[in-house]
């Protein structure tokens, strides 16, 4: 983690972002997290504190302080009564906090955990149903497990309004295709993408358009 920021907006909403540098250099991930019960107490600590914190040093930022920044932040939340289940909803965005909040409303909204789980199961059933096969339980388990693995990546990389952060770190708007990322084309061009051309051509088209956008935004033209 190169830097992270967390804001406790109110007793049921937390927002923030994290900048990392690894396989994806200077990668921005924003989040919005809501709780079904109000937070009573919370605290934070930076496991990699800065040598000098400026004016922040005069505050006790480890207990009930609504904003913290650092490279090694850990937090805890106390909800008091644990007699009822706690539901936590989280949405991500590479664009910004507003995007994460909009994604949270659009994709989680008023749904319960059970409703979200049922929707996820239904969508996976639709994906797995593109191929009908017969055989032993072991063979079918291997086939559909492998098919499941093909659906994990490439993954959608944009907000619900079509905005996404390009490889040029600018915010782009797409209207005619779904933007994808995590291609690993050197491994997947032999079998995965030909499979997509057979079982999910719409997704294959979106992936190609995403690659073309990547090419146009890249200073290296790759």
Go through the PLM ranges and name each one:
Residues 1-180, 213:
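Beta-sandwich/jelly-roll carbohydrate-recognition scaffolds of carbohydrate-active enzymes
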Residues 145-158, 181-205:
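Alpha-helical support elements that line or immediately flank enzyme active sites
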Residues 154, 200-221:
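Long, well-ordered core segments of solenoidal/helical folds
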